Regions:
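Flexible, charged surface loops at secondary-structure boundaries
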Residues: 148-150, 213-214
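C-terminal soluble interaction/assembly domains
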Residues: 162-217, 221
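Metal-dependent phosphodiesterase/phospholipase catalytic core, i.e.
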Residues: 1-139, 143-144, 150-153, 157-162, ...
């Protein structure tokens, strides 16, 4: 693919390709406006421009997607992303940036071979990932978290790996956050959606309160 080719595509909220119906019908209408697919550089320009005009200091949190697949296409996606971030001043832990990735070998490479000095998050999955040999079941263990702590600053688990439900009104919480915090890792669970709540949460406020107050995670996605 080329940037010019991708720019011909229209970006929209998620929809079911079989029916054309929006997956989340309460969000921005599908097909209402012909938004283009932005590049990472354009997104960084937007964030920094809005920071200037609004007097804010919002950071960025990009994800390295499928590094193994990209290498098979002859592209080092991690090096490319880190180079773009560096051009815009995102280099160290003093800068407002987190880089995240599901592939543990790539997370280690980002910190070691590529020499990235900023904040780094190992994403966790509750199932296999496309073209990744990462053993996510192991990474969720204390031993696995210990390996993560050698190279990363935090973990990003799905909600269900932190809270499994409620029994008699009490949250059923796994040991993941406790174990991660004991190793100095931050925990940023994903994905918080007001229109796709876990079965145990009666409202978005309840979901936020459970994770931020009762469980004590460090951030949300």
């Amino acid at each position: 693919f080329t940037v010019a080719g991708l720019k011909q595509l229209a970006a929209s909220e998620r929809f079911d390709p079989r029916t054309g119906n929006a997956v989340f019908p309460g969000r921005f209408p599908v097909g209402r406006s012909p938004f283009q697919v932005p590049t990472l550089e354009e997104e960084l320009q937007l964030v920094q421009g809005l920071n200037k005009s609004r007097g804010r200091d919002a950071g960025v949190y990009p994800e390295i997607k499928e590094p193994v697949w990209h290498r098979k296409q002859g592209q080092d996606i991690s090096r490319i992303v880190l180079d773009v971030l560096a051009r815009y001043g995102y280099r160290t832990k003093a800068d407002k940036v987190y880089v995240q990735c599901f592939d543990f070998e790539e997370v280690k490479r980002i910190r070691g071979e590529l020499g990235y000095q900023g904040r780094l998050v190992q994403l966790l999955a509750d199932g296999p990932q496309f073209e990744s040999a990462t053993d996510h079941a192991f990474l969720r263990t204390r031993a696995g978290l210990g390996e993560i702590a050698k190279v990363a600053d935090g973990i990003g688990p799905p909600l269900g790996l932190v809270v499994t439900g409620k029994t008699g009104g009490a949250l059923q919480v796994t040991d993941l956050v406790r174990d991660a915090h004991a190793l100095g890792l931050q925990v940023h669970p994903y994905t918080f959606r007001a229109d796709a709540l876990p079965a145990w949460a009666g409202s978005f406020d309840e979901l936020l309160r459970a994770f931020l107050v009762e469980v004590g995670v460090d951030g949300i996605f």
